[in-house]
Amino acid sequence: MTRFLFAIILGLLLTACQQETVEETEFVPHKLTELRVGTLYGPQIYMTSGQGNSGFDYDMAVLFAEYLDVPLKMVPYTNLAELYDALKKNEIDIIAAGMTETPARREHFRLGPPLYRVNQVLVYREGMPAPKDISDLKGKITVIADSSFVETLTQLQKRHPTLVWDQVTDKDNEELLTMIANKEIDYTIADSSSVQINRRYLPVLRSGLVLEEKLNVVWLLPPTHSDGLMSQLLAFWHQEKLAGTLDHLNEKYFGHVKRFDYIDTRAFLRAIETVLPRYRQHFETHAGDLDWRKLAATSYQESHWNPNARSPTGVRGMMMLTQPTAKEIGITNRLDAEESIRGGAAYLRDMINRLPESIPESQRMWFALASYNIGYAHVEDARKLAESMELNPNAWQDLKKVLPLLQKRKYYQKTRYGYARGSEAVHYVDSIRRYYDTLVWVDNQSKQQNSEEVAPSDLTAEETPVPAPGTLSPDKPK
């Protein structure tokens, strides 16, 4: 009842505030039999794979459908024009596609509350001169038709009349970034989050001029007759904001991609091609209920897939096991690649199982990896420290803030197990997450090339059914 009254109040307030753009209608709580969400494919928006669906917008859509207590139907489109047209024709209820707030969108749609913020940046290839001003461009800009980037360029053209650009309707943002990497086009414009994600696979991408700063990423609703859905969306957003869901999803999709190492990324991509094939079967065999790519990413962080690796502290092998750990899990030869992988998988699984049940499934791997790196006891110290600071001890985004404090006497003297190099654990986990994301991308590209199925670009408005509420949650493994 409280949620219902809150939704009505929000709806009435919203109607009063937007009378200049929205026709006045008597407010009626919005009733849906299913939530039809129009979207675009993209790693931070909506992706499907054998491991499940993912994406910031997708995860939020799942939660919103659960909040409304209706099934979710994701409806991907191939371009923005189709997406806008579908909303206009009432074929979808909402657009959730990583779209930024712009003057034109404010004029033609109702905008939901902010999910996260991005900058619009000029993107070019490594080796090209870095333009200091839009007038310094030594080539042509190519952008997606009907996108916010066209609006930005139109405004820039008023100050730079010679500025020209190409618009494409048959490409998406990821394809344009790939074309930059392949020297097929000179420049494009992209959201900073998209560049950060894609340079893990396309390390030659460079971010240049910041053309727009701190733009809100929002969902779009129809301009009229959407009071009910908008009020429910606002109530849902308020609930999830207070619950920390937005912070969690921000960390999940963007928290580990801000740090970038060009040389390391190039070396990792080469290792995937030349070294991984020798050991992939071992990772797949011994991963068990773990994703083999997470196990492989951990091994690369530990040893760069070198079975003879050793450190000054005495850890050795593909998974860099200590002698006591190897003995405990029944490994007799740490330099045998398969034995080391089997042992590392068993040890990592043990770390996951030791964690408190209060830690969500989607974050247990990151806590376990931190334990793998600095020890379970120090991670428990950090969790208790987080709780004393009124942070969430079960949220990785909060533990990331606390772990480096274990290096400061002011904090570690209060803990049971004392000093630990917590900042290294944060870097360790973030690196593995980046390696894992790259492995997933390469694996999906390989499967797509070998598949005889119709490519997504040849589809029109494919409807993807999603399990009913309660059967899937962002806190379940992807």
From Swiss-Prot:
Region described as Disordered: spans on this chain: 447-478
InterPro entries the record matches: Lysozyme-like_dom_sf, MltF, Solute-binding_3/MltF_N, Transglycosylase_SLT_dom_1
Enzyme Commission number(s) from the entry: 4.2.2.n1
Keyword Heme: no
Example of a GO MF term: peptidoglycan lytic transglycosylase activity
Topological relation to the membrane, as annotated: Peripheral membrane protein
Disulphide bridges: none
Catalytic activity, reaction form: Exolytic cleavage of the (1->4)-beta-glycosidic linkage between N-acetylmuramic acid (MurNAc) and N-acetylglucosamine (GlcNAc) residues in peptidoglycan, from either the reducing or the non-reducing ends of the peptidoglycan chains, with concomitant formation of a 1,6-anhydrobond in the MurNAc residue
Top-level taxonomic group: Bacteria
Main location class: membrane
Places the protein is found: Cell outer membrane
One Gene Ontology term from the biological process aspect of the record: cell wall macromolecule catabolic process
Function in brief: Murein-degrading enzyme that degrades murein glycan strands and insoluble, high-molecular weight murein sacculi, with the concomitant formation of a 1,6-anhydromuramoyl product. Lytic transglycosylases (LTs) play an integral role in the metabolism of the peptidoglycan (PG) sacculus. Their lytic action creates space within the PG sacculus to allow for its expansion as well as for the insertion of various structures such as secretion systems and flagella.
Protein name: Membrane-bound lytic murein transglycosylase F
Organism (species): Shewanella oneidensis (strain ATCC 700550 / JCM 31522 / CIP 106686 / LMG 19005 / NCIMB 14063 / MR-1)
Gene responsible for this protein: mltF
